[in-house]
UniProtKB/Swiss-Prot annotation:
Nucleotidyltransferase involved in the post-translational modification of proteins. It can catalyze the addition of adenosine monophosphate (AMP) or uridine monophosphate (UMP) to a protein, resulting in modifications known as AMPylation and UMPylation. Its cofactor is Mg(2+); Mn(2+). Its EC number is 2.7.7.-, 2.7.7.108. This is Protein nucleotidyltransferase YdiU. The gene is ydiU. Mg(2+) binds at residues 257, 266. It catalyses: L-seryl-[protein] + ATP = 3-O-(5'-adenylyl)-L-seryl-[protein] + diphosphate; L-threonyl-[protein] + ATP = 3-O-(5'-adenylyl)-L-threonyl-[protein] + diphosphate; L-tyrosyl-[protein] + ATP = O-(5'-adenylyl)-L-tyrosyl-[protein] + diphosphate; L-histidyl-[protein] + UTP = N(tele)-(5'-uridylyl)-L-histidyl-[protein] + diphosphate. It comes from the Bacteria. Belongs to the SELO family. One of its GO terms (molecular function) is ATP binding.
Length: 490
């Protein structure tokens, strides 16, 4: 089948502009394929958004694509090369178990990568087997869709297939392949790779390509590389604020897991915070708390500093001048983050305007929440609904004092109560993909029962809907002496 007929049948409008880059950035390779694949999850709503034929793709025809048994006609899949600072240590990486099938261009001109994750070994696999297990792929499907509904920029999941093979991790698990949709997979680590192992022309080609793809408005600007750096810094500041505002902890914020588009990517050891504690860590390999909840803004800044270092030759031919430009740009992150963070927190507290003591008010609430081990999400839900059930925090003198200050501040707004509540409801999710709910969904799914997962996914489509039907998803996990721990799944 040629590309035209394939497009007519599936809705995929295919290109691969990444192949226009110098060949140090990729390696052409076909997926290994699956012997006995089965379509486990297909994202019908995402398929519709992309203008795809969901009926055809949710069939054996689509299954063969998602299982790596068929590739897009006329387009060679590629594994992308990149580097990464893993827990601060620089290393050569690349797609060790993923292949970019191509790019889908929607009718309104938006371009999306279509990538298979878990499709077999590549030249970048190092010691890995190139495969993925079912539970981590379903986990990414659930959480990425949850993040999307929360309004947080993220890669999406189009499909998950089981391969019919077993993969060895801590134990033997069902093999799987995830089809991931992303604005692109260009990472901070891609630029670090170009700066370390490429020529100046390679670096320039990558920057020009990325600007054209993600920031076309600056493509013809005289100082486009400086503006490029500033745009990426701004997007990351916005993204991290959105993470923090819902208690999302990425878990492995290496430079290879920060994409230039400003989307959330790679959901391996991520989790959502229940009890508010800035030191919260879930990842089994984050022994020192490098990527703890409260440290995520600092880690984003650290990653962006590495990005600016990679761009130095493009910022100015004179190294000293380039360093000064980079420092000035990087210094803006903290100001931007603070601005976006307090704006978001004002909205979570029903405040439309900015006042001098707002920061103290916000910090006062958070410190009280930490002291009394309040649930992050449910505390803001309680404030939104004006219903207080957590005796420990809400009966404390600190909270009562804070509550009076907050009510006084709301009076200064002089807004109708309905307006205030609507603002709070639109910024305080009623439900999130809580860790114990996700784990229950995965546990059942591994046994072949997808009922709970399907119900959870349906509920997560409307996280800001304060519906009685969703109340069961607001319940906290049972108290346990065993802390919740996440794993990369690789």
């Amino acid at each position: 089948m040629d590309n035209k007929n394939f497009q007519s049948k599936t809705g995929f409008n295919l290109e691969n502009t990444y192949l226009t880059l110098p060949n140090i950035f990729f390696s052409e390779q076909n997926p290994k394929g699956s012997k006995n694949p089965k379509l486990i999850k297909f994202n019908t709503s995402l398929a519709k958004e992309l203008g795809l034929n969901e009926e055809i793709l949710n069939s054996d025809f689509g299954l063969n694509i998602f299982a790596g048994n068929e590739t897009f006609p006329g387009i060679t899949p590629i594994a992308q090369a990149y580097a990464g600072h893993q827990f601060g240590h620089f290393t050569m990486l690349g797609d060790g178990r993923a292949l970019l099938l191509g790019e889908h261009v929607t009718k309104d001109g938006k371009r999306y990568d279509v990538q298979l994750k878990g499709s077999g070994r590549t030249i970048y696999s190092r010691g890995g087997d190139g495969k993925a297990a079912l539970a981590p792929m379903l986990r990414e499907y659930i959480i990425s869709e949850g993040m999307h509904s929360l309004g947080i920029p993220t890669t999406r999941s189009l499909a998950v297939v089981s391969t019919g093979e077993e993969v060895l991790r801590e134990k033997f698990e069902q093999g799987a392949i995830l089809t991931r949709i992303a604005s692109s997979h260009i990472r901070v680590g891609t630029f670090a790779y170009a700066a370390q192992w490429g020529t100046l022309e390679d670096l320039k080609s990558l920057a020009d390509y990325t600007i054209k793809r993600h920031f076309p408005n600056i493509a013809n600007s005289e100082n486009k590389y400086i503006l490029f750096l500033e745009e990426v810094i701004n997007r990351q500041a916005e993204l991290i604020v959105k993470w923090q505002s819902v208690g999302f902890i990425h878990g492995v914020m290496n430079t290879d897991n920060m994409v230039i588009s400003g989307e959330t990517i790679d959901y391996g050891p991520c989790a959502f915070m229940d009890t508010y504690d800035t030191n919260t860590v879930f990842s089994s390999i984050d022994y020192a708390g490098r990527y703890a909840y409260g440290n995520q803004p600092n880690m984003a800044l650290w990653n962006l500093a590495r990005f600016s270092e990679a761009l130095l030759p493009l910022l100015n031919p004179n190294l000293d001048e380039a360093v000064n430009i980079a420092k000035k740009s990087i210094s803006s992150f903290s100001k931007l983050y603070k601005k976006y963070w307090f704006n978001k927190m004002r909205a979570k507290l029903g405040l439309f305007t900015k006042k001098e003591n707002d920061e103290l008010l916000i910090e006062g609430l958070l410190s009280t929440m930490q002291k009394y081990e309040a649930d992050f999400t449910n505390t803001f839900v309680s404030l939104t609904l004006n219903k207080f059930e957590d005796e420990k925090v809400f009966s404390s003198n600190e909270f009562k004092t804070w509550y009076a200050l907050w009510k006084d501040r709301l009076k200064e707004e002089n807004r109708p109560k309905e307006e205030v509540r609507n603002l709070m409801m639109n910024n305080n999710p009623y439900i999130i993909p809580r860790n114990h709910l996700v784990e229950e969904a995965l546990k059942n799914a591994e046994k072949g029962d997808f009922t709970f997962m399907d119900n959870l996914l349906e509920a997560l489509k409307n996280p800001y809907s304060y519906s009685k039907d969703l109340e069961k998803y607001t319940k906290l996990p049972e108290k346990s002496d065993i802390p919740y721990v996440t794993y990369c799944g690789t």
